[in-house]
Amino acid sequence: MNVIDLRSDTVTQPTPAMREAMASAPVGDDVYGEDPTINELQALAAEMLGKEAGLFVASGTMGNLTSVLTHCGRGEEMILGKQAHIFRYEAGSAAAYGGVHPNTLQVQPDGTLDLDEIRQTIRPDNEHHPVTRLICLENTQGGVMGAPLPVSYMRQVGEIAREHGLKLHVDGARLFNAAAALGVTARELVEDADSASICLSKGLCAPVGSVIVGSRDFIKRAHRIRKSLGGGMRQAGILGAAGLIALREMSRPERLSEDHANARSLAEGLAALPYITLDLSTVRTNMFKFWLAADAPITAEGLMHALEADYGILIRPYSLDERSFRLVTHFYIQAEQVRKVVSAIGELLGAHEHAVAG
């Protein structure tokens, strides 16, 4: 049974081209700056995002943490969303390792932070308050199911940051998904950012790694932070080779738009089933959430286990208490897999019997 894994786009496997490139990659000691493949990857990422330099890191969490600690000192503050990955899913690392205080705002349904709230949250020059240093945005915003933040909004936040002498960091784990959905370049989306991180191992299919980009001075300082976090790697070009293919081939808008179309198709199929509630207006990129009715013939936990045991389909509960699930499409979810998932969930919910009875 071939597994259909919809838990996340982090489950993607390296493509055959990536595996071949990894096997023959030129390598060197990256701590000495001598790995030619990593140097090429960093330069490519910087060029694609319109920045001066890049730095390869082991994960998105390390990339965000390195960026935050490069921008902020101990006791200083960053403004970000309550639903931001940095705040919710990175183990409080900025506070734990850097003493950086998070000041959180509610993320709007479209993934943005309210501009007036951002302005009002910036601290006055007062000894009783931490010093505001940084604004963090996430694009796409995973906390509201992959909402892409448009260029116009990114520019407005950049203007606010500059007006107040702050820095802007963009967690762009799925930045190329945002670019594909909006019909713009990734470079345009981070033009006003002082730093950005992009993940290579989600929808882009590389096995490991992220790249952070910024000015040469920022990256020079980030090198030291990365080292202090244990992120210096030796012959990392084996990983960088896959990253180069991720950026050159898998980040293309036409490639990622397929994932978005499959997410839309899957959502529409599920929305037509009984006992499922799903807001199609929230299906904007490659992920969405659905709810299972309380009177469904199977519990949320039962649905999850039956799909795995009987159909080889893996899904992830967003909240079992709320009977909700998040589904994420990626390179290994195509039209055939979409049809199988809709059919399997329909069978478990008794869709045919429900239609006959109706």
Model-derived features: positions:
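Conserved PLP-enzyme active-site core in the AAT-like
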Residues: 1-310, 317-333, 337, 341-358
